[in-house]
Amino acid sequence: MMRLVIILIVLLLISFSAY
């Protein structure tokens, strides 16, 4: 369960930095 949350946060950070 925790891994899914971490993956989602990482994806959000990547999308923000790409933005």
Curated annotation (Swiss-Prot):
Toxic component of a type I toxin-antitoxin (TA) system. Overexpression causes cessation of growth and rapid membrane depolarization. Overexpression induces stress-response, the psp phage shock and a number of membrane protein genes. It comes from Escherichia coli (strain K12). This is Small toxic protein IbsC. One of its GO terms (biological process) is programmed cell death. It comes from the Bacteria. Pfam families: Ibs_toxin (PF13956). InterPro entries: Toxin_Ibs. The gene is ibsC. Disruption phenotype: None seen. An isbC overproducing strain cannot be made in the absence of the sibC gene.
